[in-house]
Swiss-Prot record:
Belongs to the branched chain amino acid transporter family. It is a multi-pass membrane protein. This is Putative branched-chain amino acid carrier protein SERP0977. The chain crosses the membrane at residues 5-25, 40-60, 74-94, 114-134, 143-163, 193-213, 229-249, 290-310, 317-337, 350-370, 382-402, 417-437. Disulfide bonds: none annotated. Component of the transport system for branched-chain amino acids (leucine, isoleucine and valine), which is coupled to a proton motive force. One of its GO terms (molecular function) is L-leucine transmembrane transporter activity. GO terms for cellular component: plasma membrane. The keyword Transcription does not apply. It is found in: Cell membrane. Keywords: Amino-acid transport, Cell membrane, Membrane, Transmembrane, Transmembrane helix, Transport. It comes from the Bacteria. One of its GO terms (biological process) is L-leucine transport.
């Protein structure tokens, strides 16, 4: 393993690692109670395992996911990538960076979480983002290269102090209505992992990793594939350590029920409160300020990277509209949504992610299968169509818009995993039907 592989591995870690990756495992630890381990392991599966798999699978074709998706259907490739870029961009991920920064800085320091304070903060925040994105230079890279090690060192220090301060406490009782068995803990952790959005982000990040490996002089697809796996494992190990550690500490922080009620009444995010509690307990007032500033800078650089990526993609598919117009438009959309507050942004993302994630997981696995088993286009199209339809119908039923009894009776519906057995059966059916269809097998381009 050479130096470049380590650098690429930690670069991938930096791309995946954001404030949301701190909030969700910590809150999961608190809420899971005695069913912490099945919950956190399932969370790691969707929050780390799937993103790792997503990056690796993207290296199977020299054109990345654009090439792989085009082999399924050019129309699917265009529509699904647009949905993914909007999801990890202006609709959810970018607004979340602003609202998270607000809750990690202004709320704990000024004890003010009002709408006016949020509005003023997001105006300043997105003006900085606008300036950096309209004038992209090495400033963002320099901030990122300095910030990531500093953020990692700070979090590790906080984790060590957290184990000292809270590790001896007994596990809290958690949310017994949602976490009442090992299986329910697993299913809750699995779906909570959706909120990191890293699995769908891996589809966008994969090409960045592949190009970075190519710049080191490696050109053969098999060697690129191997280096991608190693780099992905480096990032995954770092994320596993942080997720489990933060979750474990969150599981052993005893928050009075009155405090939880007060947080819910103020619509303040519990995860950010737990992190601030850890920092303050460990390092006093200094820890609260330091964590707030570092997380805000991490969110800022993440927002800039996402705005640039999304704007460049849309400029590529709609070249008549200038890049800067997309930048301004997506920042305005992000600004409006960020002012709904962190909890509102998270709540809005849940229904959308419940549809996107099953499709994303299915397509990643189908591409991986096609790498080893001769596969025709229709064998991938059938399960994707069925999973997409089932996910939409399940969302409609879950939200109570229309009650569909068939959806309620599906296996694993209670655990929000009803799409998985359907995906397995649909894949088997797709491959059987493909034997009777005259199509050439999918071949991923290596050179």
């Amino acid at each position: 393993m050479n130096k470049n592989t380590w650098i690429i591995g930690f670069t991938l870690f930096a791309m995946f690692f954001g404030a949301g990756n701190l909030i969700f495992p910590t809150q999961l630890g608190l809420e899971s109670g005695h069913f912490f381990w099945p919950a956190i392991l399932a969370f790691a599966l969707t929050g780390i395992g799937l993103p790792l798999l997503g990056v690796v699978v993207g290296a199977l074709d020299k054109h990345g996911y654009i090439g792989s998706f085009n082999k399924i259907s050019p129309r699917f490739s265009l529509i699904f990538l647009i949905i993914i870029y909007l999801t990890i961009g202006p609709l959810f991920a970018i607004p979340r960076t602003a609202s998270t920064s607000f809750e990690m800085t202004v709320t704990p320091i000024a004890h003010n979480s009002g709408n006016l304070a949020l509005f003023i903060f997001t105006v300043i925040y997105f003006l900085i983002v606008l300036y950096l994105c309209l004038n992209p230079n090495k400033m963002i890279d320099r901030i990122g290269s300095l910030l990531t090690p500093l953020l990692l060192i700070t979090i590790v220090a906080m984790i060590i102090k957290g184990f000292v301060d809270f590790g001896g406490h007994s596990s809290n009782y958690g949310m017994t209505n949602a976490y009442h068995s090992n299986l329910s803990g697993f299913s809750q952790g699995f779906t909570q992992g959706y909120l990191t959005m890293d699995a769908i982000a891996s589809i966008a990040f994969s090409m960045i990793v592949v190009n970075a490996i190519k710049t080191t002089g490696i050109q053969h697809a098999d060697k690129i594939f191997k280096q991608t796996i190693i780099a992905g494992l480096i990032a995954a190990i770092a994320l596993v350590f942080i997720y489990i550690s933060l979750g474990y500490i969150g599981n052993h922080i005893n928050i009075p029920s009155d405090t939880l009620k007060e947080l819910k009444a103020k619509d303040q995010n519990i995860g950010t409160y737990l992190l601030t509690t850890m920092a303050t307990k460990g390092f006093g007032t200094f820890g609260k300020y330091l964590l707030g500033i570092i997380v805000s800078l991490a969110c800022l650089t993440t927002a800039c990277g996402l705005i640039v990526s999304v704007s460049e993609y849309f400029h590529r598919i709609i070249p008549k509209i200038p890049y800067k117009v997309f930048v301004v438009f997506f920042i305005l959309v992000s600004f409006i949504l960020a002012n709904q507050g962190l909890n509102s942004v998270i709540k809005m993302s849940v229904p959308v992610l419940s549809v996107i994630y099953p499709v994303a997981i299915t397509v990643i696995l189908l591409i991986l299968i096609a790498r080893f088993i001769p596969t025709k286009r229709i064998a991938q199209q059938i399960p994707l169509i069925i999973v997409a339809i089932e996910s939409i119908l399940s969302l409609i039923t879950t939200q109570g818009w229309i009650r569909i009894s068939l959806i309620d009776s599906l296996p694993l519906k209670e655990y929000s995993l009803e799409w998985f057995p359907i995906a397995v059966v649909a894949t088997l059916v797709g491959y059987m039907i493909s034997y009777f269809v005259k199509q050439s097998n999918i071949v991923y381009q290596k050179e």
